[in-house]
Amino acid sequence: MYYFLTQDLESAFKLTCLVKGTVDRTNFNCNCSLYKDYDFDVFLNVIKEAIKNNTEANGKFCNLKSGKVYLAVFYDDDVGQERGLLLFSIEEGSWFSNSKSKSAVEHLQVRFDSSRLSAGISRATAGLLRGLVDAGVVDRAIGGGSTSYQEEVKNAYLKLGFNMSYEFCYEKNSSSACYEKQADTDKQLEENIE
């Protein structure tokens, strides 16, 4: 299942739209649901940082605006029935795909640190995402990925035992190994890519 936090940042926290099954990019089955047991400021800070860094680092590719960024809690088909955390943009020609299609949702992986080849996330943001998992809001938080080096980064992570090109991964009821391993994998990733 997919939960989208929609509209502007303030109302985004209050309204979620539920999409059942596989994402249909044109037809959304919207059922309202509220998160009442978690601090709104944590969500807000995550979204604000994503907007700030994407806009500053990728202005010519990115159409990110506060009213057009969606936070999604989603069903991950690759790993089974887990909920994860990603950011989405609904703008035509979104930053990640640079697509000109008019799909309702364009995939935008979390990108917080443009200086890193694998589009990693900052420690501060990783801590916020980890907090969402620890609080039980989501079972799994992921971030990172790549743009021009997408396949190379994915292959590098496969060699390190990751199933996909995630720079950051933290799961409910698991050790913090994947979170703490982030800094140690940077050099290995660059070596594998080279």
Label each region the model flagged.
Residues 117-132:
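Conserved acetyl-CoA-binding loop-helix of GNAT-fold acetyltransferases
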